[in-house]
Amino acid sequence: KTWHAGWANSYSVGIDICQQPSLKWKNHYVKKGYDIQETTNDTGRGEKRIISLDPNVALAVREAVKSLCTALDIPYQFPCGSDGQSYDGDFYHGVVDKSYLINNFTGVIGHHHITKKKWDCACWWDTLFG
């Protein structure tokens, strides 16, 4: 059981992306050899200027999520639409209704879908799953 997703811990498998989007971490990741750049976060969640997700990290996360979805028979789908209660349309980066997530949703969510307090990994969601 994971402990970082609050109420969703009982309903989820947690994956930790070991990279931070905040610009204050840029020099740290450059020194470690990450392939990152400064970029704009257009999700409306978190800081406006961020560092991009390293392509190797993005690939590893994407493949891990796909593998978990296959192994656990979880549909590889995400909250979309104007309120996150659709599987079609643009990705939704807001908080999705808790009752909907518990009773109706089956798929992949991020911290940003369950609480306003966390904005990771909204800024990288399109890179990861788009």
What are these regions (language model features)?
Residues 1-76:
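Active-site-adjacent loop/helix surface patches within enzyme catalytic domains
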